Amino acid sequence: MLSVEMISRQNRCHYVYKGGNMMRRILHIVLITALMFLNVMYTFEAVKAAEPQQPISIEKAIQQKEGQALVEGYAVGQAVSPQHYKLTSPFSNDYNVALADRKNKTSPEHILPVQIPSAFRSQFGLQTNPLLLGKKITVQGKLENYFNTTGLKNVQSMNVTDDTKTPPAEQQVTINEARGRLNEEVTIKGIITADQNAIGGGKLSTFLQDETGGINIYSPSPEQFPELKEGMDVTVTGKITSYQGLKEIVPNSSGIKINQSNQSLPAPKHLTINELINGSLGDQYEGRLVKLTAFVSSIPSSPAGGGYNVTMIDDDHHAMTLRVMNETGVINELDEGKWYEFTGVLSRYQTFQLLPRKSADLKLLEEQPAPPSAEGEYEGIVDRVVDGDTIHLKSPVLGTTKIRFVNVDAPETYHTPKNDADENQLRFGKKASDYLKTVLSPGDKITVKVGSEAKDSYGRLLGQVITESGSNVNLELVKNGYAPTYFIWPVDNEEDYQQFQAAVAAAKKDQKGIWNENDPLMEMPFEFRAREQGKGLTRYVGDSSNKTYVQPADWKKIAVENRIFFASASEAESAGYKKRQTAPQEHVPLRILSMNDLHGKIDQQYELDLDGNGTVDGTFGRMDYAAAYLKEKKAEKKNSLIVHAGDMIGGSSPVSSLLQDEPTVELMEDIGFDVGTVGNHEFDEGTDELLRILNGGDHPKGTSGYDGQNFPLVCANCKMKSTGEPFLPAYDIINVEGVPVAFIGVVTQSAAGMVMPEGIKNIEFTDEATAVNKAAEELKKKGVKAIAVLAHMSAEQNGNAITGESADLANKTDSEIDVIFAAHNHQVVNGEVNGKLIVQAFEYGKAIGVVDVEIDKTTKDIVKKSAEIVYVDQSKIEPDVSASAILKKYETIAEPIISEVVGEAAVDMEGGYSNDGDTPLGNLIADGMRAAMKTDFALMNGGGIREALKKGPITWGDLYNIQPFGNVLTKLEIKGKDLREIINAQISPVFGPDYSISGFTYTWDKETGKAVDMKMADGTEIQPDATYTLTVNNFMATATGAKYQPIGLLGKNPVTGPEDLEATVEYVKSFDEPIAYTKEGRIKLAEASDIEDPVTEDPITEEPGDDPGTEDPIKEDPRPGEDLPDIKETPGTAPVHQLPPSAISRFNEIPINNTKTADTANSISTLPLQTETAESGSDHQLPDTSAGYYNFMVIGAAVTLSGTYLYVRRKRSASRT
């Protein structure tokens, strides 16, 4: 038994031994096979990785919408806001580029906006690289929402692709197809249907038609193209655009080819006005020849924009414009009130228009149908009440749902109040509207009674509204005092006229509503509109009781119950009305002479080139010459007054300012000024000093025994803060031959931010128009109707158009005001706004204003006015002896100080505002401030630099004229980040920077109006949280205006220094050589590559308001869109993925990493793919590579095989036991 067992065990061991050898062999085979497989896989993956990824098209990317993608397309422009692209240079930034599959495929739906990271902007931003436009670009990034559409963000690489192949020629398309390819370049062919010289208005503008459609050909430069005439067969290549709804093709520079001439025209399609304006045929036939039969209802008396907008209607009063261009001569063959068959091109300017091309396009119908008449009664259902005399219906009546109540004119509610009169109008307008809502509710059935004139110029139906109960709502508005009557000739129904006029007379007698004497409507609605809209009164006013009419301005002379309004005097006379004759009245002549903005320049004279031809026209100014002109002009008239509009003192020459401007006051008294107002500079030294100037009293720097000014200063909007009482009289009344003439004073509210807050702490400047209107009401109650305003408020003139604060004042103030003497912005102005004469006589005594008026002695009102600006030309008059003596006296006193030479200028140095970058003189002054106070930085406001510094010896007087305000330097402590806020505040969105600077430099972005890059003068960084010292003047440190306020708020621990002039004098003295400051580039517009991604959220586009009669404008978004920074940066450290300066290259250069790939020759740069820090917040990941895949498989295989080997070993061990 034992031997058998041993034999069995031996056999089993032999078996196990043999089995172990077999397992080892199998394991070796598996390992070898696995390693060979992995090696093959590695080679396969490496080859696969080496194959370049093929880019997808822009259309494919747009369809894909999301995910990683390599896209390729042409740079066609830049996204400026959702669905709006700028397609031509110059571009405003480098934040994004728009790609499309073709250079001319630029409809928004075919464009992919690509966000450009900061690392690529120097190479791919279109502001920096405008020549990149039209180049083919390949971009690797992530598809996601950008500018509210599919875009490409998180960009990893950008390359310019070789695009040397000639693109396929653009295939010709039909006009109908071309009309649907907005912003794309197309080629079309057709027949010219009108001579461009007949309908083009001086431009290349005519129409092309084929069998499928028509389109306008337009270019503002006709001289670049052949003249197009009717019947030409032409081929046009250009871009499809749209203007005011009209589809146009703008031809390329050589994009018009004339194939043949004298070809037959397409036959015009006979349509109706209703089919065009209320159906789809308008769009279908736009740009094509059509025929219409219509009635000419009105022909304007004068053209607008090179042609006449004639109104034509059909039998049902559907209206359309017949646009008759001057060059056609057609207007002279048209008769109002006739039926015609018109042939022309269907055009569009927001709404459809018909353009006749020649006289043959007009055919007067031989049998004239009766004129269209809408007169009658129509049923309707109320939808809503719009205002006190307008409602909307649920369904159209005569083509419109808008009903304007006829015979009445309710107070307006469309406006935002700016003064008491506006508030009053709005309050009564709401009362009328609220009343209307009590009698008319949505769903109410009404009857609309329409007269012979069916619609107004806005397309609203004119009618009387009758309720189901028979109540005439129009008449009830008048009876209850919610609205006055309003009849415009012709009057349809005499019975209606008498009924309404009797109702308004009764309401007025009973003082109902708007007629309440204790709370009246301040302005009739038509009077309010004339003022608020700035158009003035234009309709002549007839008196139905005696058949006379008066000028528009005299409307008050006719009682409301007798008023009928006419479009012109000739219309009134055609209706049988005669011009109202009044007995000849004796008129009182009055001359008013004016000055403004003298600024104490009593000794200064100027060489001027008045006509801008480059030749000096003479020497102008100096107060003894101005005195001679004023006295001479005063002597020419029996009645003369001399006035001024402020800023006569302050910022003065040394000869005046060294003695507290008492020399200027003495000269004004010698000349004989009668009244003036205050400007902001009258407050330069505060209210106490201004009162001393007016009332007298000695000043340490003034003359002994100073007795004050002998004429008043008036200011209606200068009020005491504590009580609201006047700081100065609101007005002054001067009797001229028994007629009172009043002068109201007013100063711009912005003066509060232009002077030392401490000096005016007890007063405030209230709303100008409100103050003037209140003063005018007081004057009218006193029987004063001849009223002028001395307004230290801006005005400027371009041709006949006057704008600015004074123009706004003219539109907002009482109609009894006849003349406004403007000031503040140193301009020459002479013209009218809203019936008010506005005059401004330049600056510094260079000119005077001469206003001549005539006053009706009976009405005491100004009935005639005119003005001229007379320059103080020294060559045409001798200086006034008395004024010369006064001037000489004070020049002698000031001479020793003024004439001291303190330095020498090697060049002319300009100063002022830094709108266009730093200025030489501004740099000099700012450096002097910084040196005087030994600070890190200095700032000087542009308005404080009053003159330029001329080449040659520099006197104390020269520097005084440059810095005349006597401000004191102030040192403040600020943080580095505060400096940025201070600088940003002074950058105007319109004009740019203000301050001159020292100790640092900065660049700024015109789009954002913000500083971009700020550095110390030596180029080192300004640390945001470090403390620095800053020098400003005490005006800047304490002013409360928006641009100055951050200085006072952020500056700490103020230290007072010397006067600014003293610092400049000492700095100039410190130079051993002639001073030659230049424009150094301390302030520059930012290069696009300097601008960081400025926003971190979706762009917000504000919706414009709905202004009646206007389209919503498409404007470029001032922000660059949602340009999210791809890499977050920590202040003071280099950005993780920022390319080094040496890597910044232009397109078609070697890539950044200098590593050749299949596309090396055309690659620009590839963003390095480094592992990001936790702070970066970026989701950029390394892409899968063959190496990564291979390593993963090797590790997996090794683990698997190791496990298998261990398992076998364990089994083997178990078997042995």
UniProtKB/Swiss-Prot annotation:
Cofactor(s) required for function per UniProt: Ca(2+); Mn(2+)
Q: Where is this region: Disordered?
A: 1087-1142
Its record classes its membrane topology as:
Peptidoglycan-anchor
CDD domains in the record: MPP_YhcR_N, SNc, YhcR_OBF_like
Q: Which UniProt keywords apply?
A: Calcium, Cell wall, Endonuclease, Hydrolase, Manganese, Metal-binding, Nuclease, Nucleotide-binding, Peptidoglycan-anchor, Secreted, Signal
For this protein, what is the EC number?
3.1.31.-
Q: What residues bind substrate, as annotated?
A: F965, F1035, M1036, A1037, T1038, A1039, T1040, G1041, A1042
Instruction: Name the segments for region: Phosphoesterase.
Output: 590-828
Known regulation of its activity is: Requires a minimum of 0.1 mM of calcium for a significant activity. Maximal activity was observed with concentrations of calcium between 1 to 5 mM. Is 10-fold less active with the corresponding concentrations of manganese. Inhibited by NaCl at concentrations of 100 mM and higher.
> PROSITE patterns given for it?
5_NUCLEOTIDASE_2 (PS00786), GRAM_POS_ANCHORING (PS50847), TNASE_3 (PS50830)
Pro-piece positions: 1186-1217
Q: Which residues make up the binding site for a divalent metal cation 1?
A: D597, H599, D647
Q: Name one GO biological process term.
A: nucleotide catabolic process
An example of a Gene Ontology cellular component annotation for this protein is:
outer membrane-bounded periplasmic space
Question: Which parts of the sequence form the motif LPXTG sorting signal?
Answer: 1182-1186
Q: Where is this region: 5'-nucleotidase?
A: 829-1085
The cross-references to NCBIfam families, in alphabetical order and at most eight, read:
LPXTG_anchor
Q: What is this protein called?
A: Endonuclease YhcR
